Amino acid sequence: MNPLGQIPVLMDDGFVLPDAQAILVYLAAKYDSTEAWYSKDPKLQGRITQWLAFADSITGSCSAARLHDKLGFKLNIEQARKEGHQNLRLLDDHLVENKIVGKDWLVLNRPTIADIACFPYVALAEEGGISLNDYPAARSWINRFKKLPQFIVMPGIPPLHGMKNNEGEFFNQEGLCFS
């Protein structure tokens, strides 16, 4: 189905599209008439696209380390973890800078597809042996994400390693807090 031989792949009315980031752009451009997730402003599109590309870097590091630890993929785990920490430092620093100017998300004052693209790899980094302890802004960003009204934990994913939110509460499979 996917000419690149990868997942994910989207089929929409006979249109086949591979690549997670391309799928996010397509879905937002086609179905989000409010521009809540993907702006029509070229400057904002550029910023969003910058973070979509960054999500690919996180895939090659944090997600790769997780594939190694969870599924036994053969790769240079030390290099993947090193790059994962470098990527998390960049993300954390950016989130700190954004917080200073009143933004809680990667590009705007609300989540965009840029946040969606980066979130799963950051949230699951610890499953690849990459601790989030040194990245408080990233941890806060994850917790903000989990508090979104539409947030649903993906089936089969543990409650994000029992990670606590800023109030010291854990999230269960339904995304609800419990002590």
Which sequence ranges carry the predicted segments?
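GST-like domain detector, emphasizing the conserved glutathione-binding G-site
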Residues: 1-85, 97
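A structural signal for well-ordered alpha-helical segments within the folded catalytic domains
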Residues: 21-22, 46, 57, 82-89, ...
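Non-transmembrane alpha-helical segments in soluble domains
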Residues: 24, 28, 49-52, 85-88, ...
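A broad structural signal for alpha-helix termini and local helix breaks/kinks
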Residues: 31, 95, 128-129, 149
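Short beta-strand edge/turn micro-motifs at domain boundaries
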Residues: 48, 150-152
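GST superfamily/GST-like fold recognition
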Residues: 62-63, 105-145, 152
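Hydrophobic alpha-helical bundle segments that form small-molecule/ligand-binding pockets
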Residues: 91-107
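Acidic/histidine-enriched, glycine/proline-rich intrinsically disordered or flexible terminal extensions
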Residues: 157-179
